Amino acid sequence: MMKVLVVVALLVTLISYSSSEGIDDLEADELLSLMANEQTRKECIPKHHECTSNKHGCCRGNFFKYKCQCTTVVTQDGEQTERCFCGTPPHHKAAELMVGFGKKIFG
C-alpha cells in the first residue's frame, strides 16, 4: 500500500513539475515585454521577497520555481495597490510534502 502511495506522490510531483514548466512557456509573451523594457535581472528573487516589479524573477525552490503571488492592499488613504511576493503555490507545497514524506519513509 505504501509503495502505491509513493508512486502516486511521484506521479503528482512529475505532473506538477511539467505543468509549471508549461505555464512558464505560456507566460513567454509577458517575459518578452519585460525584456523589451530591459528589466531582466541576473539575480533571482528569493522566497518571501517582493516581486512586484519583476514577476518572472523568482528563484527556484527544491523542486519547483517559486511563483510571484500578488494581492491588493488598501492603504490608510483608501488607495489600492498591488503587492507581490515570491512563494510556493499550494499544489506545489502538497507535492513537496508528499515527496519529503516518501523520502523519510524509504530513506
UniProtKB/Swiss-Prot annotation:
- Its predominant location is secreted
| Protein family | Belongs to the neurotoxin 19 (CSTX) family. 04 (U1-Lctx) subfamily.
Per the UniProt record, the source organism is Lycosa singoriensis
Which residues of the precursor form the propeptide?
Answer: 21-41
- Signal peptide limits: 1-20
What does UniProt say about this protein's domains? The presence of a 'disulfide through disulfide knot' structurally defines this protein as a knottin.
Q: Name one GO molecular function term.
A: toxin activity
Record flagged with keyword Chaperone: no
Cellular component terms (Gene Ontology): extracellular region
Enumerate the InterPro entries for this protein: Spider_toxin_CSTX_knottin, Spider_toxin_CSTX_Knottin_CS
So which domain of life are we looking at?
Answer: Eukaryota
UniProt keywords (A-Z) are:
Disulfide bond, Knottin, Secreted, Signal, Toxin
- Asked if Disulfide bond is a keyword of the record, the answer is yes
Give the disulfide map.
C44-C59, C51-C68, C58-C86, C70-C84
Expression across tissues: Expressed by the venom gland.
* Compartments where found: Secreted
Name under which the protein is recorded = U1-lycotoxin-Ls1e
